[in-house]
Regions:
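N-terminal and secondary-structure boundary signal
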Residues: 1-198
């Protein structure tokens, strides 16, 4: 018998996790296996609608729209570079009520009350406390994982590592062409706190 994705069940799960209106919520997800399981290509869209409704316009919803091509010398276009972090993140980028934060490596698609504030953050280092990660920490944000093991997606650990200057990582600079929301091209530098090679 074909299983059907239950929107009500998803809402119940959010209830049980304490996800509510006005929350500041970061959602990491992998919906591919769920789409296969339920044979439902519209599943990311259904989930997105429920999450938007849940946090409401007075809350703030963030999806990771990370892309590491800038680290390999490729151009970064704020409006057109795709996310490498899944269908739900890429779907959010297509919605005109979401905006994208500035960092070319660890950007976020953002909806809600504080989206402009977060999108305007200028953080040279991907994991610094003046990044969207820091915003979530300062504002008691929550992190929801959908069909992901936290060991594969808990990027916040790198924020803690940078904050305490762990000895096994260092700041590595990346330089490349950056195309901003006004289509202005410039050469920009960004840093990522990367693991030292053995």
């Amino acid at each position: 018998m074909q299983k059907i994705f239950s929107e009500n069940r998803f809402k119940e799960v959010l209830d049980n996790l304490g996800i509510k209106q006005n929350d500041k919520l970061l959602v990491n997800s992998n919906t591919l296996n769920l789409m296969i399981k339920y044979r439902d290509k519209s599943l990311p869209s259904k989930m997105l609608d429920i999450l938007i409704e849940r946090v409401d316009s007075n809350g703030t919803l963030l999806f990771p729209t990370y892309n590491w091509e800038f680290c390999n010398g490729l151009n970064y276009d704020l409006l057109n570079t795709k996310s490498a972090t899944g269908a739900l993140s890429n779907l959010s980028l297509k919605k005109n009520f979401f905006i994208r934060s500035k960092n070319p490596i660890y950007s976020f698609s953002i909806y809600g009350k504080n989206k402009d504030e977060i999108a305007q953050l200028n953080h040279y280092s991907c994991f610094s406390l003046d990044s969207p990660f820091g915003y979530l920490i300062r504002n008691k944000g929550k992190n929801l994982f959908i069909d992901l093991d936290y060991k594969d997606a808990f990027t916040f650990v790198h924020v803690a590592e940078e904050d305490v200057s762990v000895s096994y990582r260092y700041h590595k600079k990346f330089t490349g062409k950056y195309i901003d929301k006004n289509k202005v091209e410039k050469i920009e530098n960004f840093e990522m706190y990367v693991r030292k090679e053995d």
